[in-house]
Amino acid sequence: MMSYLKQPPYAMNGLGLSGAAMDLLHPSVGYPATPRKQRRERTTFTRSQLDILEALFAKTRYPDIFMREEVALKINLPESRVQVWFKNRRAKCRQQQQSGSSTKTRPAKKKSSPTRESTGSESSGQFTPPAVSSAGSSSSSSSSTNNTGISSTSTSISTVSSIWSPAISPGSAPPSVSLPEPVAPSNTSCMQRSVSGTASSTYPMPYNQTTGYSQGYPTPSGSYFSGVDCGSYLAPMHSHHHPHQLSPMTASSMPTHPHHHISQSSGHHHHHHHQAYSGTGLAFNSSDCLDYKEQTASSWKLNFNTTDCLDYKDQASWRFQVL
């Protein structure tokens, strides 16, 4: 009646008659299209059958196919039942030995509890240790994925660092004028780089040095150097003068430019501000600023980019853009 309760009460267009509902109409006929595989009933051994099996087990724990066939004929059971009985009997013997030494009692109990059950009983015991090992491997793999996630975040940080880099790219300057600074990316800080002009390839330094820059200038250079606002800050500036550099300013489309490209724009940027605002009157690099018409420091505002200093007359009209 269980199969009848699981079936819908009416046949849907005659489809419900196949399967277990047919077994109700013809209970004597077995149909292979049952919805669920029926569990095989347990084989119950009589005392005489067990005596014969135990006698063979005393002789050998691993009987070959011929010995199993012979015993199966004696006890009037199929050979597969004899094979499963020997398998479970060996498992029971192992469990007794392990319980004597009190090691691995739990998985052994799973093996030994059904002495005469088929292979499902032992497979349940056999699958528990691989589950533990697979859990260990999954934890190790998760830790490895964590490591790779960390490394990927670091690499993403390094790629984000390239948002700033294409400030003094040869795209704005003529290709013949190659910059001497970005050839050797060193690990010097951005403050040192603003004086020495050496490129800095480390990502956090240009942004960690914002306080150093903000000491000299009252403008909010923290928002200027925030890692997220770099692309959105540089993009509107470059949209006025160099529309071909809009795409390098976005973080996603910047895989090709070198890393010292960012520190360059930041470093050179403030390099000139140190020269301009401190009043030292140092000459500008000819490679950085190719054709300045007005080099007075009063006309340059803080958002002055070295990419924009190629023959622009109206530096006084540029303002600092606070985002």
Curated annotation (Swiss-Prot):
Tissue: Embryonic expression is highly dynamic. In early gastrula embryos, expressed in the involuting presumptive anterior mesoderm. Found in the head rudiment at 9 hours of development, and at 12 hours of development expression increases at the caudal side but decreases at the rostral side. With the extension of the body axis, expression extends to neuroectodermal regions fated to become fore- and mid-brain; detected in the presumptive border between the midbrain and the hindbrain at 18 hours of development, and found in the diencephalon and the midbrain at 24 hours of development.
Subcellular location: Nucleus
UniProt biased composition (Basic residues): 257-275
GO terms under cellular component: nucleus
Keyword Transmembrane helix attached: no
Keyword Nucleus part of the UniProt annotation: yes
PANTHER family: HOMEOBOX PROTEIN, HOMEOBOX PROTEIN OTX1
Family: Belongs to the paired homeobox family. Bicoid subfamily.
Protein name in UniProt: Homeobox protein OTX1 B
Organism name: Danio rerio (Zebrafish)
